[in-house]
Curated annotation (Swiss-Prot):
Spans traversing the lipid bilayer: none
Signal sequence segment: 1-21
Entry protein name: Uncharacterized protein ML2432
Keyword Signal part of the UniProt annotation: yes
Alphabetically ordered keywords of this record: Signal
Source organism (scientific name): Mycobacterium leprae (strain TN)
Classification via InterPro entries: IolE/XylAMocC-like, Xyl_isomerase-like_sf, Xyl_isomerase-like_TIM-brl
Gene3D superfamilies: Divalent-metal-dependent TIM barrel enzymes
Pfam families associated with the record: AP_endonuc_2 (PF01261)
Amino acid sequence: MRPVIKVGLSTASVYPLRAEAAFEYAAKLGYDGVELMVWGESVSQDIDAVKGLSRRYRVPVLSVHAPCLLISQRVWGANPVPKLERSVRAAEQLGAQTVVVHPPFRWQRRYAEGFSDQVAELEAASDVMIAVENMFPFRADRFFGADQSRERMRKRGGGPGPAISVFAPSFDPLAGNHAHYTLDLSHTATAGSDSLEMVRRMGSGLVHLHLCDGSGLPADEHLVPGRGTQPTAAVCQLLAGADFAGHVVLEVSTSSVRSATERETMLTESLQFARTYLLR
């Protein structure tokens, strides 16, 4: 019998609250663990402090998201090469299975040139998997407003249209020929990618899912799954019916909520969606 797929909560899902709130919500609502987003918050950078939160709330850390966002370029130093290695060491210390990382930015030339080799070397020396995440380009239609942007994507049948990628070699991680991948369903919406086709292309290399949604806006939305246009249920069912042995992490935006009750409702709805469609 295939094991139950574990469902985690990203600490980014409670922003602007701190990481501790994610552990608290995960424990209260019944998530199987958390994904640690390493960014500006000091606790997220302090692995001993994170260990303490994990013990206090009895919630394990399933994965670590490396500090590779634009807003976290100076976290753990400015050089992305040692930052990726440090992320793997953090995952080892926390007992996490996976490190999530974005493809390099184009201006990070030395990092980009050695990225595939570094990922392979780090994986060869550790039990931690480094799952490179699909991203999205900077779309020209972001200047036309939300409704026009969605309509333009609908008319062209998907795809980003005129756009510029800031990632090397591509916002599509499969261009890097890595062993392991993260699929983010908000990013597929923004990129106009076919999520189900990407699942098939990633194949057994798909070891981590960021479960969320998007409506096709040029901005990254991270909606509650089922509230956008992505085939979120179908993707979950496809993984549940396959030999997927990774984790599914809810990475949804709750930053616009007006109350703690509204945030809890969104996180509860997200977990219920995952449990329903990942059932084996």
